[in-house]
Amino acid sequence: MKLFLTLLSLVSLQTCISSTPPIDKKDPVWEPPLSEQKGLAKAYFAAGCFWCVEAVFESVKGVHEVYSGYAGGETKNPNYNQIGTGRTGHAEAVEVHYDPKVVSFGTLVQVFFGSHDPTTSNRQGPDRGSQYRSIAFYQNSSEREMIQDYIALLEKKEIFTNAIVTEVEPLDKFYFAEEYHQDYEKRNPNNPYVRRVSI
């Protein structure tokens, strides 16, 4: 029985990586088909496997679209295979397109902290590695202050037993992930990883 559970655990750790097809490095970089919509703002977060993070934010009223991608590292135009090595500095991240008249950036920050464990370093659920670390990206000083103030509030209220290790970083560049990662949870609801980890 112990051997079975150990094997099951090992399989689940690799599911997010192994459930996807290999990448053809000759493929052009994927860009979203959605044109920029007037009046929408963007927010960026990393909170583990982007398949599940994308699904969380897409369930929020006022969010129009969420894209999976990579951010927080140094490698230009990274692909999924490179990200999986943990040597690019990037984390799996999402770009959230939202209507600030319906949902505020502050609310998205609350959703972010409420949807993952911000006290674990380089890990979320069964996924391990720096590409799964927790990062709240900001694009201006106002967003940075909102993130920092909310972290201070969570710590003051002792919501989490352990210290929050979420990185608060300026967004340098967001790279879209390959097309097969987009809306992955929606298109693959019976994937074992999705059924076990996603909302």
What are these regions (language model features)?
Residues 16-199:
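Flexible coil/turn and secondary-structure edge motifs
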Residues 4-12:
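Sec-dependent N-terminal signal peptides
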